[in-house]
Amino acid sequence: RRHWTNVLTRYTVGVGGAAVIGAITLIFAYLLWVVAPILLPAEIAAPTEYRVVERPAALVDVSENGEAMVRISETGIVEFFSVADGSGIAAYDLGSTIVKAKRLSPLVDTYALLDNNNNLLFVKTDYIVDFDGGQRRLSPKLSFPFSNRSIPLGPLDNFDVQLADDDLVIATVRGSQVSLTRFKNVEIGYRLSGSAQVTLASTVQAQEVFLGPRNQWIYLLSKSGEIDVLGIKSLQRVSRLYQGSLAPKGSTITAVTPVLGRYSLLTANDQGDIVQWGALVNANETRFVALRSFDVEQSVAQLITEPRRKGFLSVANDGELSLLYPTSGRLLDQRPSNLPASAPMAISPRSNLLIAAPNDGLITAHSLDNKHPEISWSALWTEVWYEGYEEPIFSWQSSSADNDFEPKFSLTPLAFGTMKAAFYALLFAVPIALMGAIYTAYFMAPAMRALVKPGIEIMAALPTVILGFLGGLWLAPIIEANLSSVLSIFVFLPLLLFAFALAWSLLPEKIVHSTSGWYGLIVTPLILGSVYLAFQFGPFFENTFFGGNSRAWFLEVLGLSYDQRNALVVGIIMGLAVIPTIFSIAEDAVYAVPTHLVRGSLALGATPWQTLVKVVLLTASPGIFSAVMIGMGRAVGETMIVLMATGNTPLMDFNIFEGMRTFAANIAVELPESEVDSSHYRILFLAALVLFLFTFVLNTVAEVVRQRLRRRYGSL
């Protein structure tokens, strides 16, 4: 019977251990499986060609769902084709000759068409899905969003048009003359009315004109790279914001286009350089700085931007296609092609298809596999120069209310916040837990130990959400209102304890020995008294040393700003959560030191303190080290306390009076709201993988060190 019991126990333990290892392996495999797609390279696929009716194209585009293509020809014919086989679906005749066509930014289904009489007409495409005999059918429709009346513009060299909220602006340029027409309270389906017009003189002979963000700026550029930026928030008070050059001396601008949101411009020159220029606006001036550059090694003839992301595609003079993304600074893929450099092209709204009309009777489609262009090693871990910022920064900001928002996916602030929270928690917890464990196991009276040890261990059962709640809503306001008093505790407590210890040593030997092991209970009133004195004298210290306002003093003298929910609160509250773990393991390690070692040391003449330092702590060092490492793992992975007791702001500042955002808290907050399989979703899983690997490596190193300590001191 004993044999079968041993066999059953052995296999049960073995299966349990294998299950734990298997679970850890599965967790790692699943995290890696979710993260893996962001490591795959982007690709421009080989083209698919469609033979269609020969007509010169002014514009080509793709429907939202990628099932239909539209070609607006110079003869005024609007045709729809199937992406699957290139077959014609529908056609409409506008009855006019089109010389130039553009998307009505930021819409992806509305276009501004300029005819040969310089009249501007807006058209809108709709795709209706119905079922005929059980078969799905796509029916394209062409409509006029602002009525079928065209808008006369007069002589012009180029134009741009943009709809921002309910504000429609049309800008035309002819030489150095700029004309602006603004329509207010614009709604799709209603006729345009109530226009305001103004004509301005520019300082450059502009060949390109682009409206800026929210129709508040206008960019005017010449072929030589000269730029004139005007503020047009009010047509009655137009101001010049910037005047300068966006091209190296001796070079010529060959292509220019705004990036989504229009806070920056992309320029390509005849030397093969593509530069992203960002506008920096402050109260005193507006500047344009080169945020980043790309070298495609040959002259670029055309730049095609993505409708809903910051990415773009360049077309070289020999037809080579280059797929790039500014934020990550990556040249994603290149592919040679036979496309004419000036052929009308467009990237689909979902950025998965490139459509081109290389000649009158042909349409080509390149499939784009480019799901995560914003992710790169540099974008995740190094400083990135984002639009509108004075310099490269570390930043995590995954979402915004604006569709033209530039996501910021730097993991560095989250890693920094994780280490910051763990550091301050351990700074508070480790000394208290270890000293308490050593005293409880070695010096404390057995009767008192029987009460103290279970009492501290039961603290581990407290839900961290309760601790976080208390920290954020109770402790944080108290510390904010009594900062000087809280800091005074760290002065009063050690001074009073030292004075008490000195006085206690002067008492008769009989009293000292009779109370041995009960010192923890004896000094408890002293500890409470020191806290009381600190709060009583806190205002005095604040007036004497901090000029009556400690928070203002820290900011003005030390440059440390103060937030109510900060690392100090996290250190205290998370320390309370970590202390039971460290205390319990360390106390068991110290208490388990064989008594014959202690008695032998004392018998050889060592004092109890010498025995503790030279024998007990060395023998217990593997367990003490394990306690600290397990406590650190608990602090690194803590979620609810950090989430509730800090501002949860991803800062790169070690200031104890400011908060942070950690990996765990960030995952808890953002994962439920992220779109499945999006870049944001996969980066959150990458953060989980980084946290998993960190704790795995930490525990592995801790185990190696523990084993070495055990071999070294186990023979004492």
Task: For the regions a language model picked out, list residue spans one by one.
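Interhelical loop and adjacent transmembrane-helix boundary motif
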Residues: 556-560, 642-692
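C-terminal transmembrane helix and the adjacent membrane-cytosol boundary/short C-terminal tail
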Residues: 499-508, 587, 591, 595, ...
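Periplasmic/extracellular loop-to-transmembrane helix junction in inner-membrane transport proteins
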Residues: 3-7, 11, 38-72, 76, ...
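Transmembrane alpha-helices
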Residues: 583-585, 593, 608-643
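Loop-to-helix entry region at the N-terminal start of transmembrane alpha-helices
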Residues: 408-422, 476-495, 511-581
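Structural motif
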Residues: 75-81, 117-124, 175-184, 224-231, ...
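Transmembrane-helix boundary motif in ABC transporter permease subunits
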Residues: 425-456, 500-507, 702-711
